[in-house]
């Protein structure tokens, strides 16, 4: 295999495109967004933590971007990295996977490999990918190959993509071998599991584990706050135990595309088998509860100065769901911004990764990032720290903010000017 296609050039697809290019493949990046394709072909990065230099180096081996799905027929392997969101009712929304397969179907050819990397419920590959291929009169494992290999991308993380073990499940043994031959050229370790469903469930378990523990620690935080105890100090103390404890730190709520979404793919599928995933549903409830709790905390701190929300001036520090990246998908900061604005408050934000307010399917505001100075900080009744970006000047923030709600444990709380959130 010399030429591969990657469908979906976002936070997962772009790093993969770069990595395959670095390892001698000609990589074709498919995306319906023509602005992304244009930026790619100009060698311009559109994701903050990925340098343009990496894209330009990839182009030197002939890698490029396109929106023309007919080019599928020219590649040896197809890797699907499209979004898999949930509906308002927390049910799987697989429209992007279905659309990709419909568009690709006429251009599939004998000998190709398809790998689905998008996180989804167990059975998706067998229900949505394989039937489309078989409709083209291919035999899986003989003249066409299918695997599921979940993405494990951590935007802005310290561990390089190629150093993260690649999980892979094949529709047949021949499919698994074909998948290993592809991914083994890029990833240092490829772990073949016994079935596609095992691979699909592996990613769900990883994210369920984090979701449930974050739900637990945020509930713990809300109770500790009632007791007048600093949760951050409790977690730090517990983390000194060298066994049997993994530290999870509270925050303003779940964020990102994975944790607020993926666990509900599992709970939805569980109902098909007459089971209720109660821990997962409760963790989701805790995520909403902690956001509501933070709203109450804001009202409480404003009330200390006799200020109503409708006449308040509030600055939110950080729109990203995690530190040091330009990723605001499912960020609790966006929901909080909307709540303050909807209730008449004057709300602004500061985030070095978002000069302009990021538009999303749920929220869109015309706003730009506030430059942090002594003068700008003094204008606000309350500053709420939501994302622990390394580029924030924390001494400046502490010195010139009238009151701070800190959801990330940066400042020592004093219940006068600094409050835990």
Predicted regions and their residues:
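Structural/interface elements that position substrates and couple domains in central-metabolism enzymes
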Residues: 1-421
